Amino acid sequence: MATGAVPASFTALKSRDHGLGFAKSMDFVRVSDLQRVKFGRKKVSVITNSNPGSEIAELQPASQGSPLLVPRQKYCESIHKTVRRKTRTVMVGNVAIGSEHPIKIQTMTTTDTKDVAATVEQVMRIADTGADIVRITVQGKREADACYEIKNSLVQQNYNIPLVADIHFAPSVAMRVAECFDKIRVNPGNFADRRAQFETLEYTEDDYQKELEHIEQIFSPLVEKCKKYGRAMRIGTNHGSLSDRIMSYYGDSPRGMVESAFEFARICRKLDYHNFVFSMKASNPVVMVQAYRLLVAEMYVQGWDYPLHLGVTEAGEGEDGRMKSAIGIGTLLQDGLGDTIRVSLTEPPEEEIDPCRRLANLGTRAAKLQQGVAPFEEKHRHYFDFQRRTGQLPMQKEVLFQLFWDLYGELFCYFIQRLLN
């Protein structure tokens, strides 16, 4: 039986058995082969590290037994009041994103990108409604070719709103559209990798390093092109589209989302490219908030100051969609995090602008007034320990009703009869 105990957060796990993953940051994973008659399984146990290094951000319960996780390290300027996090400025066309500028509002078109006329018309409606940035999905080369026509048509009609290309699975398409659009959104989970298929569950140290080199080889030309043309970029991790490599090491977790984005960010920094923002989107607001906070905690550790794009994926429609977005985006804005936001609704994109603006105004006002809470003594509930509460019952006094009935029986019956009548 082969066993090994290794830090689960290391980029390359050194163990004789590499079937590791699904552990929290800086916990240790022990893997054992269990010999079965018909099939083999691996027993995985997590050994908590009681003294994790301060150089690695990690999540911990907000209080003893609490299901809410927050970073152990600093993840915002203040946990008592809203103070906006200081970031560098990233230029998206003629629009500046960063802590020195107002929170920018953006949305995404819903038309077929190949339908140039319909897309141009929708972008103009969005711009007239008050959006600062518009994102357009670009699936293939025909859509990329249409992007040139879309950009030219908008310029001819005096619309200079920055356009963002949403790219998945197609590095060559990103290379082409970077020549005309102002910003490229890449998803680290599927730009160079495929979305997790779980075809490969075990990665050796060499396998992991080879995939990182493969990512750098594919991603670097786009970074160089964005530098050449002065384009911005969003490294946008999606909770639902992590790669096999990330899933096998970190699982479907906020830590995996952060590590996926950092792999691409390190390549950008290596090539001296800094005109990018981060996003950590999930359809679950709790996961989304935990991922963003962990990302910021990690950036504080690294000394990075890149802006944040906030959003909840597939929030829905009507009140439900607005409430989900308000919970996720609003929580982070109260933390002082977020420099551009999108409220994702299954409605016409123009309908996203008003709730987006309301949230941006609330976040701006909270930061301006540095809204907070008065100091108070925290008393945490113990979720797993049972203890009977003590207290004093109300005073009880014995009354002799028989005497009342004997003395005033006739009068009592008279009043009862009157009530019944």
Q: What are the functions of these language-model segments?
A:
Residues 1-40:
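N-terminal chloroplast transit peptides
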Residues 83-85, 99-118, 137-139, 161-170, ...:
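Active-site mouth loops of central-metabolism enzymes
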Residues 103-109, 132-136, 161-167, 184-186, ...:
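Hydrophobic faces of well-ordered beta-strands that scaffold small-molecule active sites
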Residues 110-115, 128-154, 188-210, 276-285:
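Glycine-rich, proline-tolerant flexible connector loops at the mouths of alpha/beta enzymes
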Residues 130-132, 180-197, 335-350:
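Glycine-rich phosphate-binding active-site loops on the catalytic face of alpha/beta enzymes
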Residues 141-165, 213-230, 263, 295-304:
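Alpha-helix-loop-beta-strand connector modules within alpha/beta enzyme cores
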Residues 160-230, 234:
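Hydrophobic or amphipathic alpha-helical targeting/insertion segments
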Residues 202-219, 223, 245-405:
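Catalytic alpha/beta core domains of metabolic enzymes, predominantly
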